[in-house]
Amino acid sequence: MSNIKLVHSGGNSVSLTTPTNNPSSNVTFKLPQADGSAGQVLQTDGSGNLSWVSLPTAGLEMVDIWDLNHVATMGSGSIIYLGNSSTYSGGTAAWTRATWSATIGSAMTVSNEVFTFPSTGIYEMQYTLQTWNQSNTENAYIYARIYETTNNGSNWYNRAVSGTNAIGRSGTVYSHNRAAYIFDVTDTSTHKVKFAAQAETGATVNGDASADNNLYTYVIFKRLGDT
């Protein structure tokens, strides 16, 4: 068994030696032309070519939270897309970034109801919808819906639905539900999402109309990894 022995001026040495078992063929490793950066490691391309690469970052690279900033009125059975101000009465309900909450990495962007991702990757979305019924009004269903497009809005597909209901009683009745979805975003210019609400007899979507920095109806985005 042969080895390369590098002797220090103090007398001790460091050696590179062959594998314990005989390789199936001759193996050649080609070193990179320059030194890497601090913390990088050598990686092979499977053909013996070595290069310096950075280790993947541990933990989540991106977490972002968006909050509906006003209440929104739903008609009976109608689906409304939250953030599209043309569908609402009693004020403009828009998505605003919850900058008072902790976030990680790059932010989502939104135009009316459509969210665009900051980079490609696998994303998890947790959409919480809070609604209230007027006195003595029942709702057999209240749905939170997540829609995706992979062709920049030419087609939209409902990918997640979460349902609840509300009893009829005197006074205001609050309900909330949560829909979740994981989306493989391979192209940020075409892969986008939007969030909707629907109720049987109509209801009001609760938003942060008083700007008290409370999350009522909101979405949490997490980038889980590369596509």
Give, region by region, the residue ranges found by the protein language model.
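Surface-exposed or flexible loop/turn and strand-edge residues in extracellular/cell-surface modules
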Residues: M1-N3, G11, N26, G39, ...
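Glycine-rich strand-loop-strand elements at beta-sheet edges
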Residues: T109-S111, A140-A144, E148-D187
